[in-house]
Amino acid sequence: MDRSMSNKIRFCHFENFGILPTFDFYNISSINLIIGENGTGKTVFLKALYSATRAMEEYKRGDDIRSMADILSEKLRWTFQVEKLGDMVTRGISESLSFQMSLDEQNVVYQFSPSAERKVGAVTAPDVGRNANSIFIPAKEVLSLFSIILESREVDKSFGFDDTYYDLVKALRIAPKRGRNFDAFAKSRKNLKDVINGKVDFDERSGKWYYKDKNNYRFAIGATSEGIKKISILDRLLANGYLNDQSIIFIDEIESALHPEAICKFLDMIYEIADKMGVQVFISTHSYFVIKKLVLLAMRKKEFITCISLKKDAKKPYINDLHDGMPDNSIIDTSIQLYEQEIEEGL
């Protein structure tokens, strides 16, 4: 079913934002894939959108009286973990970093110079905050590092685990809710449980995570596979009500620790959530399997899955609808080179 883009990111503008090229991104879809070689800015791109989105969600929430400038400044510093904000500006230039994003038919705009210390400069704030919780799932799993991340941020107040990790563990602390969930969420949770043959849960008394298989045998989280832990994170967020149909999910290197079969099933669930609930998703990858699976899913609906290809020294990224087929990219090029090398070695 088609959903309005009113609850989604519809436009973003980057200028002098670290290693990213200066560009405008208009063709934003329900599912957005970011590909590129190492050092092209995939994670920077995801973190920039996530920081702005979370700032909009924290703005005017409850009794919080902080200004948008204060929220953004803190979010950017702890997400990118820079000593001063000016370090985020593209190196070797004197012009300011500028960012703009349109979400919920409202804009957030900010800029700051290379000399900026702790505060962003000019800020355009939305009229109201967002009634949603978005989440960033990093490449590293967090369940076995749960207490370490919390201590690092809440006790030591030190850099090491950025806000993507800290926000995630705080969201995972929320206990699952009883009662009816969104149908698409409930279906996805069942599918997730089938993929990992059990579920991961939190023991309030011991303060530790554990894995329970389909035969109800319990295993310490340290003895549980990385793939199970990664998939279980989404299951927990669907179960505890942290995510809703206005949430935006950012996943960095979705293929990390997952077998290709699990990747395909995981992406099927992501597609179901995006299609039935209208949840928007941004995914980065180095995996051929992820790209190919999303191309196959994109054949179901035009303008539903967009691919952004970042390339070193390119003036702007290449953006295309995956409904039109596999994009040109270094992952495919490398696969072809290996195949050609195999042929040559066999001669």
Where do the PLM segments sit?
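Pre-Walker A-like glycine/lysine-rich segment at the N-terminus of P-loop NTPase domains
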Residues: 1-51
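Phosphate-coordinating catalytic segments in nucleotide- and nucleic-acid-processing enzymes
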Residues: 2-13, 53-246, 313-347
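Phosphate-binding P-loop
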Residues: 23-29, 241-243, 273-275
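Walker B motif beta-strand of ABC-family P-loop ATPases
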Residues: 248-250
